């Protein structure tokens, strides 16, 4: 639905403007700087992170989603149409993603 500008099938559930707002970084530079330990190359839209800088191969500017500290991640990349979902039971021990998550994202990015 988010990749289709708010449409699910033939139903418009969200306006295209709402989808743009959700998936656009809403943080100021100062806020991003304050959260850089956890938001490396990312900002925050409404309900999820938004990649703003290509820090790693999978950080494509515009990628939107959730990289949770409890081992779950779900992202969509509008420029490629890719959707990635990973569910594990490996809670994060700190701000650096686990090797499993990094390997998953690397593979999902075509690496």
Where are these regions (language model features)?
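Catalytic loop of the DD-peptidase/beta-lactamase superfamily, centered on the K-T-G motif
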Residues: 1-111
